[in-house]
Amino acid sequence: MGGKRGVFHYLQRTAIQGSPTMISKIANNYQYGGDYIQTDVHPFKRHFEELQVGETIITAKHTVSEADIVNFANVSGDNFYAHMDATSLDGTIFTGRVAHGYFVLSKAAGLFVDAKKGPVLLNYGLDECRFVKPVYPGTTIGVRFTCKEKIAQEKRNPEDIAKGIVKWLVDVYDETGETVAIATILTMVKKKNQD
């Protein structure tokens, strides 16, 4: 087997080893734990071409309250015992009433989203979501919001908006700096050049 087919065949078995920073640079795909580029300009104010893989904002923080948990349960209908009944936690991994994982993710979105109209056209989805540490009332959370990957899209027709998909690493952390939730979200972002 020769030519391109042979190269692709053997590349399927290739693994790259290195630090998250090195792999991020080689693959142009941000790897968790790698160096990031902290910016003061919110990435939702930037067009697709202006975003850099590894570009990160650190958000404001929010202290989770019992009212947050009750309100989220009322809105979502998720009344799972670990969120609503502190007396039923014997024999579980929880030491007290715990916030909903989806509340933590929703609050993270409230912290990282810039609500003003800009190049971000829409939320395109969610991948790889994990809730890795319980969040109890009194826990303060913040978000490291990092441009993970950019995927250019072709216009479907001349009237279509020139755009691309941006994958973002959402790293929600507590007051100790430990990750409590991690996810990849996708947004559709307008290109500056509409040709």
Question: Would you name each region that the model predicts?
Answer:
Residues 14, 21-22, 63, 135, ...:
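A broadly conserved detector of short glycine/acidic/proline-rich loop/turn motifs that flank catalytic sites
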Residues 30-52, 131, 135-140, 144-195:
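HotDog/MaoC-like acyl-thioester-processing domains
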Residues 30-125, 192-195:
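Hot-dog-fold acyl-thioester-processing enzymes
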Residues 18-28, 123-135:
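Short, conserved aromatic-histidine micro-motifs
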Residues 1-29:
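C-terminal segments
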